Amino acid sequence: MFSFFRRKKKQETPALEEAQVQETAAKVESEVAQIVGNIKEDVESLAESVKGRAESAVETVSGAVEQVKETVAEMPSEAGEAAERVESAKEAVAETVGEAVGQVQEAVATTEEHKLGWAARLKQGLAKSRDKMAKSLAGVFGGGQIGEDLYEELETVLITGDMGMEATEYLMKDVRGRVSLKGLKDGNELRGALKEALYDLIKPLEKPLVLPETKEPFVIMLAGINGAGKTTSIGKLAKYFQAQGKSVLLAAGDTFRAAAREQLQAWGGRNNVTVISQTTGDSAAVCFDAVQAAKARIDIVLADTAGRLPTQLHLMEEIKKVKRVLQKAIPGAPHEIIVVLDANIGQNAVNQVKAFDDALGLTGLIVTKLDGTAKGGILAALASDRPVPVRYIGVGEGIDDLRPFDARAFVDRLLD
């Protein structure tokens, strides 16, 4: 950066010019010191999550400052050239400082984004579903008098919102009852009635996972079709349980999909969690080894399995085998059997839940990718047709974007 500084043969200079050089050099050192001091103060105030990047910025600035100091000490005594070179040095330092400050500001912005509360991220994640429903409901809640035409419009919106026929019929009956009971008159009041009806429908799905106090590992087996987000959900769950003070071990039981093991190992490395895997062998063997390794030292085992369609009968038999092997490893295991659902598939999610529930006896669901779909009504369809508890929902790609399902928060963000 400062390659333009070169030593020159010393020449005699009048005393006045020599004093100007020294004064200029001292001024540069003072300004540089002030710049560095300001940067260090900014860096020290950063959150822990940007500490590394901030320290890198300080090192960059400090290196530049040292070069300036060395150059000042070796400056030629020729006043004119000295002043010119000092100005160039100041510009170079200012540029370096500007770049460093930019890095710090970018890091701070990233930190602030991750500090968004869950309610804000949930609202942001449900934007597509909410926007679609809001446009469709604009005519319904526009202030017109409640009548059969309005009811027909509302029914159409609910069906096209992937709530399914059974859930739609339930909601329409419930809304009509509330309108009659409370004497509601217009579309604006109808919104509140719909929100309460939808909340009552999906509230039974809100059953947070409670971990028992036991000496044996709590085993959670995850299943689902390819692409639903099982492996990613396992990585996020590991982080979630660690935040609760639990020790976690991962079983790379997806022995079919290319790079599935490597993907889970990457999540394990990210969370500092051990991953049990095999280069050969079947899913059941991997899961069994993981449970054996976890005994007496690990709180939770998260067992990944290969993606499969419910219509692939031989693969459904294989996942039943995984369950049986886990039962042999620890009586009562797996303690939780969760299917991971991609919200983008809409009504097909109900069929998947039915098939996996019939085969395995599901205890919970994880609904992912709600941020990428306009089909947020799928939870109403599940609540009406096969009400397996929704343990967690995912509304983003961040590691903290998987949280326990909250029915009230979901309805409020969907229909606000």
UniProtKB/Swiss-Prot annotation:
What PANTHER family is this protein classified in? SIGNAL RECOGNITION PARTICLE RECEPTOR SUBUNIT ALPHA
Which membrane topology describes this protein? Peripheral membrane protein
Q: What is its main location?
A: membrane
For this UniProt record, give its keywords in alphabetical order, as a comma-separated list. Answer: Cell membrane, Cytoplasm, GTP-binding, Hydrolase, Membrane, Nucleotide-binding, Receptor
Record's SMART domains?
A: AAA, SRP54, SRP54_N
Q: Where does GTP bind?
A: 224-231, 304-308, 368-371
Which PROSITE patterns does UniProt cross-reference here?
A: SRP54
The processes (GO biological process) annotated in the record are: SRP-dependent cotranslational protein targeting to membrane
Could you tell me which species this protein originates from?
Answer: Neisseria gonorrhoeae
**SUPFAM superfamilies per the UniProt record, alphabetical:** Apolipoprotein A-I, Domain of the SRP/SRP receptor G-proteins, P-loop containing nucleoside triphosphate hydrolases
Q: Which family does it belong to?
A: Belongs to the GTP-binding SRP family. FtsY subfamily.
Subcellular location(s) per record: Cell membrane; Cytoplasm
NCBIfam families, A to Z: ftsY
Question: What is the superkingdom listed in this entry's lineage?
Answer: Bacteria
The answer, when asked if Nucleus is one of the entry's keywords, is: no
> What positions belong to coiled-coil segments?
none
Q: Which reaction does it catalyse?
A: GTP + H2O = GDP + phosphate + H(+)
Oligomeric state and interaction partners are given as: Part of the signal recognition particle protein translocation system, which is composed of SRP and FtsY. SRP is a ribonucleoprotein composed of Ffh and a 4.5S RNA molecule.
Could you say which enzyme class this protein belongs to? hydrolase
Provide the protein name.
Answer: Signal recognition particle receptor FtsY
Q: What else is known?
A: In vitro purified FtsY has been shown to bind to pilE promoter DNA in a sequence-specific manner using gel retardation assay but it cannot be explained.
- Outline the segment boundaries, as ranges, of region: Disordered: 1-24
Task: State one molecular function term (GO).
Answer: GTPase activity
Q: Which cofactor does it need?
A: Mg(2+)
Compositional bias of type Basic residues: which residue ranges? 1-10
Q: Establish whether keyword Transit peptide is in the entry.
A: no
Function in brief = Involved in targeting and insertion of nascent membrane proteins into the cytoplasmic membrane. Acts as a receptor for the complex formed by the signal recognition particle (SRP) and the ribosome-nascent chain (RNC). Interaction with SRP-RNC leads to the transfer of the RNC complex to the Sec translocase for insertion into the membrane, the hydrolysis of GTP by both Ffh and FtsY, and the dissociation of the SRP-FtsY complex into the individual components.
